[in-house]
């Protein structure tokens, strides 16, 4: 791959990530709040009568709409874009690094394995995920802390630089890498996503090629091609996210301020013990509602920018 091709993939990946992040930021804030242990801020208690006549309070987890309403009422609409700054700072380099690493790995591995085989896509996605996570984890930690900073209207909101200073004073440099083990576990989601995406993309390409051969038409990129890419991205991301979602909850807990959570497996075990298995999927609906259009927008933007820059 030439230096120009690498720069094209870097730029296209950055554009795709940025557009997706801006359009889906409110859903990202709601999802992060639902994943957090501080979700009790928005939890109501339901009083139940027992057989003996006594009453007990049962904690009921809030739904996405309940959480959204509570944020709007207590903190105002601007809080739905909390963490957007670090998100934009992080998403462009993260996606750029990811897509450039993915494309480079895929090109090199095509010479080792069968070209564009499942092994190539899996290994490329894993290496790209590892590279992007290691490089950008501090930015995502700050973004998560800002999104969890629930302050009512009128109170001064914590800024990104204040958050950076606070993390460094409390935990030192190591504090910026909290939750990275859960992010590494999440590479499985990336691998599943890209394997399914590339498989669907290949099938769509084969169908189009066969159709072109029958009609003797030249293969030209059309608007319908980008719609198909968006559908392929949405389908693959839905499957991957549903399978690997618990790592998202664990990662959010590890990134919380003053947390009792210390490591990936300790956090996973503690969440199950204290809140049950269902809590590992808290916020999944919101995550899917956000992630599906976000991924579709990101992948379609990426493919479009690569196509335009390559002529």
UniProtKB/Swiss-Prot annotation:
The record's section on InterPro entries has: Mit_carrier, Mitochondrial_sb/sol_carrier, Mt_carrier_dom_sf, SLC25A33/36-like
GO process terms (BP)? mitochondrial genome maintenance; mitochondrion organization; pyrimidine nucleotide transport; regulation of mitochondrial membrane potential
The text of the family note is: Belongs to the mitochondrial carrier (TC 2.A.29) family.
Transmembrane stretches, start-end: 7-27, 41-57, 111-131, 180-200, 226-246, 291-311
What is this protein identified as? Solute carrier family 25 member 36
Q: Which residues form a coiled coil?
A: none
Location(s), subcellular: Mitochondrion inner membrane
Q: What membrane topology is annotated for this entry?
A: Multi-pass membrane protein
Q: Which PANTHER family match?
A: MITOCHONDRIAL CARRIER PROTEIN RIM2 (PTHR45829), SOLUTE CARRIER FAMILY 25 MEMBER 36 (PTHR45829:SF2)
Residue spans of the Solcar repeats? 4-108, 116-203, 224-308
Q: What does this protein do?
A: Mitochondrial transporter that imports/exports pyrimidine nucleotides into and from mitochondria. Selectively transports cytosine, guanosine, inosine and uridine (deoxy)nucleoside mono-, di-, and triphosphates by antiport mechanism. Catalyzes uniport at much lower rate. May import (deoxy)nucleoside triphosphates in exchange for intramitochondrial (deoxy)nucleoside mono- and diphosphates, thus providing precursors necessary for de novo synthesis of mitochondrial DNA and RNA while exporting products of their catabolism.
GO MF annotation, one: pyrimidine nucleotide transmembrane transporter activity
Catalytic function, reaction form: UTP(in) + CTP(out) = UTP(out) + CTP(in); CTP(out) + UDP(in) = CTP(in) + UDP(out); UMP(in) + CTP(out) = UMP(out) + CTP(in); dUTP(in) + CTP(out) = dUTP(out) + CTP(in)
Provide the alphabetized UniProt keywords. Membrane, Mitochondrion, Mitochondrion inner membrane, Repeat, Transmembrane, Transmembrane helix, Transport
- Which GO cellular component terms, listed alphabetically, does the Swiss-Prot or TrEMBL entry include? mitochondrial inner membrane; mitochondrion
Q: Which Pfam families match?
A: Mito_carr
């Amino acid at each position: 791959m030439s230096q120009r091709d690498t720069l094209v993939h870097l730029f296209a990946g950055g554009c795709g990530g940025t557009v997706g992040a801006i359009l889906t930021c409110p859903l990202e804030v709601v999802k992060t709040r639902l994943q957090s242990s501080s979700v009790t801020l928005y939890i109501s208690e339901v009083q139940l009568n027992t057989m003996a006549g006594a009453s007990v309070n049962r904690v009921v987890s809030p739904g996405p709409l309940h959480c959204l309403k509570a944020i709007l009422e207590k903190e105002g609409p601007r809080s739905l874009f909390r963490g957007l700054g670090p998100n934009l700072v992080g998403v462009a380099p993260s996606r750029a690094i990811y897509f450039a690493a993915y494309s480079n790995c895929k090109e090199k591995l095509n010479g080792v394995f069968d070209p564009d085989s499942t092994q190539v896509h899996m290994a490329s996605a894993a290496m790209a995920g590892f590279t992007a996570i290691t490089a950008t984890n501090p930015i995502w930690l700050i973004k998560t802390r800002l999104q969890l900073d629930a302050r009512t209207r009128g109170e001064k909101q914590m800024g990104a630089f204040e958050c950076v200073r606070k993390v460094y004073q409390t935990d030192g440099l190591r504090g910026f890498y909290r939750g990275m083990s859960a992010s590494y576990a999440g590479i499985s989601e990336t691998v599943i996503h890209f394997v399914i995406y590339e498989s669907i993309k290949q099938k769509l390409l084969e169908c189009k090629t066969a159709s072109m051969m029958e009609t003797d038409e030249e293969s030209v990129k059309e608007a319908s091609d980008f719609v198909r890419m968006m559908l392929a991205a949405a389908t693959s991301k839905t499957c991957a996210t549903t399978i690997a979602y618990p790592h998202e909850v664990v990662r959010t807990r590890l990134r919380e301020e003053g947390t009792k959570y210390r490591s990936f497996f300790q956090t996973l075990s503690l969440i199950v013990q204290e809140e049950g298995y269902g809590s590992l999927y808290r916020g999944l609906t919101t995550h899917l509602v956000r992630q599906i259009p976000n991924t579709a927008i990101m992948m379609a933007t990426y493919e479009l920018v690569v196509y335009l820059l390559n002529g």
